[in-house]
């Protein structure tokens, strides 16, 4: 699974398909392939292990022609990274690419083998190719064959099929894995992400759950899950395909804050269905490894460390598995004891953080059961050297102060926690569904949270002339306070500290005065009453409070305490949600102070030296 591109045109489509794959490279992949058929029904399939450039060179050398084609970048889930496991897969005249996980692939494989089909690869995708080929023997069209096949597939998928004997059309089915159709003039396209098509069209249609669409040069016909023909909205996109262009935004950081809803959708794509987490989508052999884990050790730096600190509460509260979190530069120099059946998790946006990479190499010598990384950059050292990788797919992040990398790490960690609890039988189906539904709701909720921008911009003026700021939180909101503190100091150069609110009496309370803003992250939960007592301690000593809480929390503002009332969201994802106003606050304080938001002094995006 990873990236899909398809095209039906009068002109040769090889260049369009390969360029589309280039635009999807940020999503992570280990192999790439393309299949193109010309008007005389001659089909050329080329697959390569490695970079899209290697595929591009092979396509150029072969001088591939043809107006109908599909292409794919693969991140291995079923079957090792290899050319034979790379997409597209074929069965007779049928060629298929696929994103996602077919959960009943073993059952279908046995059925197909009983019918005489021979499998060349280890992938679940080849099952789809054979199923479509089988159904086409009795179906009236490729469309009908794909519809019949889709009804037999279980899991999250987006799949595209092409028939060599009929090069005038391709058929796509969507269930849990996004598919967008692009409209041209006398040509039409499809992809798993509109970014792949922005160089050929700006008009897009997004398929809905259960849709199957037939695409020709001149028409796109969509059928819903019941088989009824339906119309889907066509929209004009103003998205920027170049990550190096700030577009309408003043800074990359602001742009990347606003990209978070889409980034979260990308992170979740193919990894959750309507009510469950797809464990195999996390990595090769993930289900087997997670079923044996007795302890989790997270190692990271900076923002990624704060994400790990947040996830520690989830591992213990949701999955019932002990979890330690260590700063990589400390972990690697400590004489630690490896617990039995321990899983090492490294977190890094770049995948090249020197201390984290060194910690991984050290840990592999110390008997960890397995090492995985949660990372945003495919092909990075952490990805290559870990046993398996969970790519966040946040897209290129240019601003030094991480935003979308943090929230996508958190969503990836929450999916991992849920999968771990699921594989060990520690969470119920009902709890799994509750978590997944909260994740599905998160992108829209964050989009709504961004509407607080003007209110927070006005609030930022209170901080711009201060020299210090204190952030407080309890439970998983303590590391969210840590992340808020880090953001403020990174880009505004204001000294900021974060404390677990219960630690106030143990020192920080001595700092409280009218010149010390105190920001409190205070959603409604079982620690709220304890947090309220800490708020009163600050209030009694003349501190100026800024409390971010939902209406149910029951705070009443006055001249010493400003309440920023947030919508109520699920407790499960509230830590991710409350990150957004903290990012906006830091951004606008820095803007008022006139600092270099995207490239703050003394800092680099990726710390590749010790």
From Swiss-Prot:
It is found in: Cytoplasm. SUPFAM superfamilies: N-terminal nucleophile aminohydrolases (Ntn hydrolases) (SSF56235), SIS domain (SSF53697). PROSITE patterns: GATASE_TYPE_2 (PS51278), SIS (PS51464). GO terms for molecular function: carbohydrate derivative binding; glutamine-fructose-6-phosphate transaminase (isomerizing) activity. Its EC number is 2.6.1.16. Residues 2-218 form the Glutamine amidotransferase type-2 domain. It catalyses: D-fructose 6-phosphate + L-glutamine = D-glucosamine 6-phosphate + L-glutamate. InterPro entries: GATase_2_dom, GFAT, GFAT_N, GlmS/AgaS_SIS, GlmS/FrlB_SIS, Ntn_hydrolases_N, SIS_dom, SIS_dom_sf. Keywords: Aminotransferase, Cytoplasm, Glutamine amidotransferase, Repeat, Transferase. The active site is at 2 (nucleophile), 605 (for fru-6p isomerization activity). The keyword Cytoplasm applies. Residues 286-426, 459-600 form the SIS domain. One of its GO terms (cellular component) is cytosol. GO terms for biological process: carbohydrate metabolic process; fructose 6-phosphate metabolic process; protein N-linked glycosylation; UDP-N-acetylglucosamine metabolic process. Homodimer. Catalyzes the first step in hexosamine metabolism, converting fructose-6P into glucosamine-6P using glutamine as a nitrogen source. PANTHER family: GLUCOSAMINE--FRUCTOSE-6-PHOSPHATE AMINOTRANSFERASE, ISOMERIZING, GLUTAMINE--FRUCTOSE-6-PHOSPHATE TRANSAMINASE (ISOMERIZING). This is Glutamine--fructose-6-phosphate aminotransferase [isomerizing]. It comes from Vibrio parahaemolyticus serotype O3:K6 (strain RIMD 2210633).
């Amino acid at each position: 699974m990873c990236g899909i591109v398809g095209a039906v045109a009068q002109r040769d489509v090889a260049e369009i398909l390969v360029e589309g794959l280039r635009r999807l490279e940020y999503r992570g992949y280990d192999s790439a392939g393309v299949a193109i058929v010309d008007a005389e029904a001659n089909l050329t399939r080329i697959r390569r292990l490695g970079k899209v450039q290697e595929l591009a060179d092979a396509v150029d050398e072969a001088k591939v022609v043809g107006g109908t084609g599909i292409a794919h970048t693969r991140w291995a889930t079923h079957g090792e990274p290899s050319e034979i496991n790379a997409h597209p897969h074929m069965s007779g005249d049928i060629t298929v690419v696929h994103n996602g996980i077919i959960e009943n692939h073993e059952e279908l494989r046995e059925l197909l083998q009983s019918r005489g089909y021979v499998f060349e690869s280890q992938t679940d995708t080849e099952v789809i190719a054979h199923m479509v080929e089988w159904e086409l023997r009795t179906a009236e069209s490729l469309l009908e064959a794909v519809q019949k096949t889709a009804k037999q597939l279980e899991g999250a998928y987006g799949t595209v099929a092409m028939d060599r004997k009929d090069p005038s059309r391709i058929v796509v089915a969507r269930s849990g894995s996004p598919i967008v159709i692009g409209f041209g003039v006398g040509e039409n396209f499809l992809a798993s992400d509109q970014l792949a098509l922005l160089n050929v069209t700006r008009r897009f249609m997004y398929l809905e759950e259960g849709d199957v669409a037939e695409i020709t040069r001149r028409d796109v016909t969509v059928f819903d899950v019941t088989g009824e023909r339906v119309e889907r909205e066509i929209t004009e996109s103003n998205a920027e395909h170049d990550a190096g262009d700030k577009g309408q935004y003043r800074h990359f950081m602001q742009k990347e804050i606003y990209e978070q809803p889409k980034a979260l959708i990308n992170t979740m794509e193919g990894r959750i269905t309507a009510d469950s987490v797809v464990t195999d989508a996390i990595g090769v052999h993930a289900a087997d490894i997670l079923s044996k884990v007795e302890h989790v050790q997270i190692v990271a730096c900076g923002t990624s460390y704060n994400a790990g600190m947040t996830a520690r509460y989830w591992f213990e509260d949701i999955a019932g598995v002990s979890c330690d979190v260590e700063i990589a530069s400390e972990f690697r120099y400590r004489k630690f004891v490896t617990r039995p059946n321990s899983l090492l998790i490294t977190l890094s946006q770049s995948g090249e953080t020197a201390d984290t990479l060194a910690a991984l190499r050290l840990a592999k010598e110390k008997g960890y059961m397995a090492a995985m990384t949660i990372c945003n950059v495919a092909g990075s050292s952490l990805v290559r050297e870990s046993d398996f990788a969970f790519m966040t797919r946040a897209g290129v992040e240019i601003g030094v102060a991480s935003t979308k990398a943090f929230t996508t790490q958190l969503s990836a960690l929450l999916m991992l926690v849920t999968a771990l609890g699921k594989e060990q039988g520690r969470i119920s189906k009902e709890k799994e569904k509750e978590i997944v539904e909260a994740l599905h709701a998160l992108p829209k909720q964050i989009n709504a949270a961004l509407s607080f921008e003007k209110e927070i911009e006005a609030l930022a003026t209170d901080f711009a002339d201060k020299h210090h700021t204190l952030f407080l939180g309890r439970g998983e909101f303590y590391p969210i306070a840590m992340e808020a503190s880090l953001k403020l100091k990174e880009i505004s150069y204001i000294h900021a500290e974060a404390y677990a609110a219960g630690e106030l009496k143990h020192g920080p309370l001595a700092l409280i005065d009218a010149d010390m803003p105190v920001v409190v992250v205070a959603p409604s939960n079982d620690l709220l009453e304890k947090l309220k007592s800490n708020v009163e301690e600050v209030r009694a000593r003349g501190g100026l409070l800024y409390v971010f809480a939902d209406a149910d929390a029951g705070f009443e503002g006055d001249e010493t305490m400003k309440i920023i009332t947030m919508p109520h969201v699920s407790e499960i994802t509230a830590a991710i949600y409350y990150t957004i106003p903290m990012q906006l606050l830091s951004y606008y304080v820095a803007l008022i102070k006139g600092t270099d938001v995207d490239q703050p002094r003394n800092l680099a995006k990726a710390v590749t030296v010790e």
